[in-house]
Amino acid sequence: MEAFETFITNVTDFVWGGTWGDKTILPVGPVVVLLLGAGLYFMVKLKFRPLKRFIPALAEVWAGRKGDGDKSKITAWQALSTALSGQVGTGNLAGVATAITLGGPGAIFWMWITAIFGMALAFAESSLAIKYRETDKYGRVNGGPMYYIKNGLGQSWGWLAVLFCIGTLFSATATGGMVQANSITQSVQETSRAFSLPCQLSQPAIKGIRLVNNGVAKADQMNKADLAKVSACELETSNPDTLVIILEDVEGSDTLVNTASVEAGSNNLDTVIANWLIGLIIAALVFAVIIGGIKSIGSVAGKVVPLMAVAYIGIAFVVILMNASEVPQAFAAIFKGAFGWSAATGGFTGAVLAIAIRAGVDRGLFSNEAGQGSAPIAHAAAQTKNPTTQGEIAMIGVFIDTILICTMTALVILCVQGDFVNAAGEPVKYAYQAAGLEATAITNAAYASAIPGGGWVVTIAIAFFAFTTIIGWSYYAEQAVTYLVGEWATKLIRYIWVGVIFVGALTQVGFIWMLGGLANASMAVPNLIAILALSGVVLAMHKKNGDPDTEDGDSIMLKGEGVE
C-alpha cells in the first residue's frame, strides 16, 4: 500500500509540478501549462470579454432569476447556484490554507491568475454546453463536456467523452463526495469536543504521566520538572486525537508546552456524537434533495448557496476590518511571494516561484473548477437558448468562488495574529506558520484567534459548503453515468451516491485526499482538449453573440442552434 501511495503521489506531483520524487522532470507541470495556456488563449481570442462584459454579466445573473417557464430546465440563476454549490466547498477553506502553507502567500496571486483565465475557460465550456446539450425521451436535459465532445467533435472522439465521464466519477466519488462528507463529520466532532475537553485545570501531574479524567495520556516532553500542574488544555486542531497541555512546575518558575497523545483504549477523546449518526443525517438530507433531480437540486442551491456565500463573506470582512492594519503587509507578502521573493534569502529564487505557481494553480482549480468541466454540466440545464449568455453567467461563478470567497479566507489567514509556535519552538505570528496546523485547522485557528467562538464560523461554513458540494457533484456523477450506460441508471446512481456519502462520513479519507489532484486532472485534461478543439465554435459564438467590440453584437441571438 505504501508503494502504491508513493506512486500516486509521484504521478500527482508530475502532472501538477513536473517533479517525480526528488527529480525535476519539467519546470512546470503539464496540467498547469495546459490550464494556464488554454485560459490565456481564450482570454486573448475573446478580446478579454470576461473583463469587458463583467458588469453586464452581473445583470444577466440577476435577470436569470426568472427563467423562461420551461419546466424541463432550471433558471439561469439556479444553474449558477448549482455550479457554485460544486465550486464553493472545503477548497475555499482548506484549499486556501494549503496553498499558503505549500507555496507561501504568493500562491494566492496565482490562484487569482487561475481564476481570471478561468473566467475565459468558464465562458467557453458553458457556452458549448448550451449549444450541444440534448433532451432525452423523458424531457430531461443532458449536457456537459461529454455531449459537446460527441456532438461537436463527432463520434470518432467518443473515447475522449468516455475518459471525461470516468474522470468525473473518479473526482465525484473522491473529492466531491467522500471527502466532503468526512469534512462535515470531522468538523462537527472537533467543535463538539471543544466543549467537553477531558482536562481539569490545576490538576497535579507527575513527570511523564498525565492523569486525565481516569484516562491516561503520555507526554512527549516533560523533562523540566518532576512535578507539574496543568494550566491549560486544548485539542490540537490538526489532530483531534491529541491534547496540547500547557504545564507549569509547582513553583511556577517554568512554563512547559507539551503534546500528550492519548493512549490507545483511553476514553478521553471518545467521539461526542457517533460518526454513524452524523453520516446518517448527512445521507438523509442529501437524499431528500437529490431524489428530485436537477429541479430539486437547483431549487435548494438557488436559496442556500447565495445565503451561505454572503454570510461567510460578511463575517470574513468584519474580521479583516478588525485587523485592517495588517492588510497592506498581507498584500505585500502575496505580490512578493508570487514572483519568487524569499524571506529566507532576502531575494528572488526560481524554486520559490515554481512552488507558488504550482500550489496556487492546483488549489485554484480545486476551488473554482474552471476548465475542469464540472460546472458546464450544471449550466447545460439552464433555461436559455443563447449559449453566450449562460457562458457569461458561468464566468461570474469563478469570480465569486476565488476572487471573493478564497481571497477573504486568505486575508483572514494572513492578517490575524495569535500565539503560535513553529517547528523550532519559536513564537510566530500567524497560524499558517505554526507547527502542527494544516488545511482547515489553519483557517480555524485564524478565526478562533480573531473573534470569540471563531471556530464555529469554520465549522458552520464547512457544513454548508461541503453539503452543497455533495448535492452539486451528485448531479455531475448522475450525468456521467447516464452518458455511459443510459437513462435507466439515473435513479440508481442517486441511491448509490447516498451510500457513498454515508461511507465517506465514517471512513478515514487521508488517502482519498491524496487522490484529489489526480482526480481533478483526470477531468481537466479531456475537457481542455475538447474546448481547444472546439475553439473555432466558441469564437464564432462570441462574434455572433455580443462581441464586446461590436456595437450591435448583443442584439444577435442564436436561434434553434444546438441539439435540443
Q: Each predicted region: which residue ranges?
A:
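Helix-loop-helix hairpins and the membrane-proximal interhelical loops
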Residues: V11-S72, S296-A359
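Alpha-helical membrane segments and immediately flanking helix-loop junctions
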Residues: G69-L102, K131-M146, K150-G152, L163-L169, ...
